Amino acid sequence: LNLKVTLGIQMVLMPEFKDEIIPFAKLAVDLGVDYGVIKHCSDDEFGTLGVDYSKYEEMYDLLDEAEKLGNENTKIIVKWDKIQDKGKPSYKRFYGPQFLLQISGSGLVAPSGMFFNARYSKLHIGNFVDERFKDIFKSDAYWKIMNYLASPSFDAQTMMGTLPIQHYASTALDMHIKGTSRIQPAHDEPPLHVNFL
């Protein structure tokens, strides 16, 4: 088909699986995928998975070694920022969902995959099985939920799981709003995967 695609594999790293870091990196290189990503494991706000984020630091040398296994064909990428954050975001307001909504396999539209569970039904924006996504996006429910997540009534450090996919957007927007690091227009080449699905 001669399509321009990028192939990657991911490892969701829990401390008890540290012995799998190097084999994972070697597998990515052996398969010849474009990248192998090693990222932290998100836990919910109750710590249901029991992830001990303090133990990630003990794996830094292994993660460095894994990155060095990459070559010109396969990049081994460690999501250092999230791993080093030890499960706690620097922000309390959750601004990221306005830029990166998530949709479940059932069609449920929510601000984050962390909110797909029925216990978060008040944060369910709609379901595109029943209505057009455009209508969901323009709905009062959308804005009510987005405004709530960005308000002092919501605390991202205690009221949701750890470091969701919207983490980087929320961090950048929080620093911009606080004036600690302003978001600047990009002048470089557009990044790959701007329309990642």
Where would I find each of the regions flagged by the language model?
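Radical SAM enzyme [4Fe-4S]-AdoMet core and its adjacent flexible, acidic
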Residues: 1-131
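Flexible mid-to-C-terminal extensions adjoining Fe-S/redox cofactors in radical SAM and related proteins
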Residues: 114-197
